[in-house]
UniProtKB/Swiss-Prot annotation:
It comes from the Eukaryota. GO terms for cellular component: extracellular region. Keywords: Disulfide bond, Secreted, Signal, Toxin. It is found in: Secreted. One of its GO terms (molecular function) is toxin activity. Belongs to the neurotoxin 19 (CSTX) family. 06 (U6-Lctx) subfamily. Residues 1-21 form the signal peptide. This is U6-lycotoxin-Ls1c. The presence of a 'disulfide through disulfide knot' structurally defines this protein as a knottin.
């Protein structure tokens, strides 16, 4: 009986881990931030990163999912 309960508990834990991993793999849509997970943009998109400056001082890097083969230029 103890073995059966232990096996059921292990299966539940494994299932929860798999569900959590699937949620982390969910793709990031267009124009959403991908700084922490650059490989998770939806198909047809790429994670493009920019270094942000405020008054000449670097304030970190931010990344966004954008369309592949699209180039953005400053105005």
């Amino acid at each position: 009986m103890k073995l059966l309960l232990f096996t059921a508990l292990v299966l539940v834990v494994i299932s929860l881990i798999e569900v959590e991993a699937e949620n982390e793999r969910a793709c990031i849509p267009l124009e959403k931030e991908c700084t922490k997970t650059p490989g998770n943009c939806c198909s047809g998109l790429k994670c493009n990163c920019y270094r942000r400056f405020e008054q000449g001082v670097a304030k970190g890097i931010q990344c966004w999912c954008i369309e592949k083969d699209v180039t953005y230029k400053g105005v």
